[in-house]
């Protein structure tokens, strides 16, 4: 049970996006971000590994990390923000943690994440 006023909850539910794919920490995603340059707007892709995810309704956010010219870059996106145009899951990662902050200390091949394979059918 949420402790929010029903009116606040109704307004927040109207703001929620419905076209967000299911993704988890460890997944490699491409986030299309709306960038305003002067009077024109364009989409900029930010591709990286999801290292954290916070599910809080309208306040949901996720952190994406990538290596750009040898420097680690992390960006926190608000899941339901109008700035985020599209989220595309490129690769599913198989990890045993919810927060992958340990990847900050690793570099090169040590920072690789195993790919999650589809479940085998028994029988």
From Swiss-Prot:
One of its GO terms (molecular function) is structural constituent of ribosome. InterPro entries: Ribosomal_bL19, Ribosomal_bL19_CS, Ribosomal_bL19_sf, Translation_prot_SH3-like_sf. Keywords: Ribonucleoprotein, Ribosomal protein. One of its GO terms (biological process) is translation. GO terms for cellular component: cytosolic large ribosomal subunit. The keyword Ribosomal protein applies. Pfam families: Ribosomal_L19. It comes from the Bacteria. Belongs to the bacterial ribosomal protein bL19 family. This protein is located at the 30S-50S ribosomal subunit interface and may play a role in the structure and function of the aminoacyl-tRNA binding site. This is Large ribosomal subunit protein bL19. The gene is rplS.
